[in-house]
């Protein structure tokens, strides 16, 4: 199955998701534009509503009620994809990652939910800030889009 997310906002781009079967990892590829230099939190959020500056997307997708964590942590939200690194606003930020927790199949599917790129670095739940265990203290929302099925 394949899915696409058209990211819009201060940051924009296209992100593609591909998963061959429910028990296989999801390949995440694409690009983002206009990202300030540095690391930016990158998460699937619970709702496919991208209005109000992406705030209507809700919290990180967390159907299993876990603490926030790194993509490779034993405990994490389903939507915790870590960080993307940008070389600066004039550079294209290429996205190439794989994730074993998100899925395009079944009741925990990310289809119809939103993808959000944040203003700040995700501390992966390891920081001292009170928001570390829920959002990774990753700040505001630079861009977002709805994850939808695309043609093969």
Swiss-Prot record:
Keyword Disulfide bond: yes
Assigned EC number: 1.15.1.1
Keyword Transcription regulation annotated: no
Chain sites annotated for binding Zn(2+): 60, 68, 77, 80
Residue runs in coiled coils: none
Cofactor(s) required, per the database record: Cu cation; Zn(2+)
Molecular function in Gene Ontology: copper ion binding; superoxide dismutase activity
Record-annotated disulphide pairs: 54-144
Leading EC class: oxidoreductase
Keywords of the record: Antioxidant, Copper, Disulfide bond, Late protein, Metal-binding, Oxidoreductase, Zinc
Co-factor binding comment: Binds 1 copper ion per subunit. Binds 1 zinc ion per subunit.
Pfam families given in the database record: Sod_Cu
CDD domains: Cu-Zn_Superoxide_Dismutase
Domain of life: Viruses
Family per record: Belongs to the Cu-Zn superoxide dismutase family.
Biological function: Destroys radicals which are normally produced within the cells and which are toxic to biological systems.
The name this protein goes by in its record: Putative superoxide dismutase [Cu-Zn]
The species this protein was found in: Orgyia pseudotsugata multicapsid polyhedrosis virus (OpMNPV)
Gene designation: SOD
């Amino acid at each position: 199955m394949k899915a696409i997310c058209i990211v819009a906002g201060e940051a924009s781009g296209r992100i593609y998701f591909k998963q061959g079967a429910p028990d296989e990892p999801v390949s995440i590829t694409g690009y983002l534009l206009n990202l300030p230099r540095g690391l930016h939190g990158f998460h699937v959020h619970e709702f496919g509503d991208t209005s109000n500056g992406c705030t209507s997307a809700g919290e990180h997708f967390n159907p299993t009620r876990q603490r926030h964590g790194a993509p490779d942590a034993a405990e994490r939200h389903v939507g915790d994809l870590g960080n993307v690194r940008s070389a600066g606003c004039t550079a294209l930020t290429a996205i190439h990652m794989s994730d074993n927790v998100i899925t395009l199949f079944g009741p925990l599917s990310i289809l119809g939910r939103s993808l959000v790129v944040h203003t700040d670095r995700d501390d992966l739940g390891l920081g001292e800030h009170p928001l570390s265990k829920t959002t990774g203290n990753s700040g505001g929302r630079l861009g977002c889009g709805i994850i939808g099925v695309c043609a093969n």
